[in-house]
C-alpha cells in the first residue's frame, strides 16, 4: 500500500506493522528525505562510482621488462634469413611480456558527499512514492532468532523477490533471523546507499533504524526527525 499523504501537508505516513500482523501506530516520512526529486542521471553516476570503488584492482601482468630471462640475443643479427630479434621475452614470443595488459590500479572515483546524499534521497523517495517502504516494530517476537518466522513476516509485507532490511546494529536477533534468507539484504541505518536501495524491490525498516536514520540526517542539517505516533 502506498504511503498516505495528509491533506495540506507534505508529510507521508506509513503503518508500523508487528510480527503478529497487527498495526502499531504510524510513522512519518519527512518529505526532505522521502519525497525528493529522483535525478536518474545523478543516481546512475553515484552507483557507477560505488560499483567502481568495489573493484579490487589487484590484476597485474608482466611486460617484457618484468619477465625473467631474455637478456641474451636469441640468434645472430644477420645471415639466418629470419627477422632480427633482440630478446626472447619480446611480446611476440611464447613466454614473452604482455603488451598493454592490466596493471595494478585504483578504480575509485571521487564523488562529492552532497551528490551521494542527493542520490540516496532520490532513491528512497522513489521507493516511498511507490509504497515500497515498510516499517516494523521488530522482525521476530522475543530474543530467540527464527528464520522461519522472519520469512513469514516479510512475506506478509511484500511478495517481491529482493528485499532490503534495515535494522539497528544492536538487533542481533533480527540480524540472525534474516541473514540466510535468499533475496534479503541486511544493512544498518548508517550503511544505507543508493545502489542497495535501487537494487531492492522493497525496503523494510525497523522503527529504531528509521528514527536513527532520520535523526542522523537532522544532525547533518538535512531533515527534521519524526517519531512514531499512535
Swiss-Prot record:
It holds the Pfam family Ribosomal_L4. Residues 51-105 are annotated as: Disordered. One of its GO terms (cellular component) is ribosome. InterPro entries: Ribosomal_uL4, Ribosomal_uL4-like, Ribosomal_uL4_dom_sf. It comes from the Bacteria. GO terms for molecular function: rRNA binding; structural constituent of ribosome. One of the primary rRNA binding proteins, this protein initially binds near the 5'-end of the 23S rRNA. It is important during the early stages of 50S assembly. It makes multiple contacts with different domains of the 23S rRNA in the assembled 50S subunit and ribosome. Belongs to the universal ribosomal protein uL4 family. HAMAP family: Ribosomal_uL4_B. This is Large ribosomal subunit protein uL4. The lineage of its organism: Bacteria, Bacillati, Actinomycetota, Actinomycetes, Mycobacteriales.
